[in-house]
Amino acid sequence: MTPIGVVRSTLRDRGDAPRQAFEGGPEATLEIDPEFAPALDRVTVGTELIVVTWLHEADRTVLRVHPRDDERIPLTGVFATRSSDRPNPIGLHRVTVTGAGPPTRIRVDALEAIDGTPILDLKVAMPQAPDA
């Protein structure tokens, strides 16, 4: 897979990031590589997107975690958690476009990805399938 761009955020390391999307993240900018500019046609303010990211700082060897790093919770297989540490650390983030410009920079609300996170894809969010 080839990233199409990167996230630009005030979140500088994993410890700064919310553990879940519903905990809120800061506004961020999706910096898309210029060669993909035509693919942004009709992505406008108000568009809801699913941002697919590669969680590049994740530990791909981890198979079990204490959910939310709470050792009072029993070790749980990563496929039964939302942990970013997993064999294939793909992130899915539902966001709304809040601004655009220059042509390959898109401003979005509440994105819980750290600065420099590679973006793999953008997909329009479907209201009838909230997580698709």
Predicted feature residues:
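Glycine-rich, low-complexity intrinsically disordered segments
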Residues: M1-R94, T98-A132
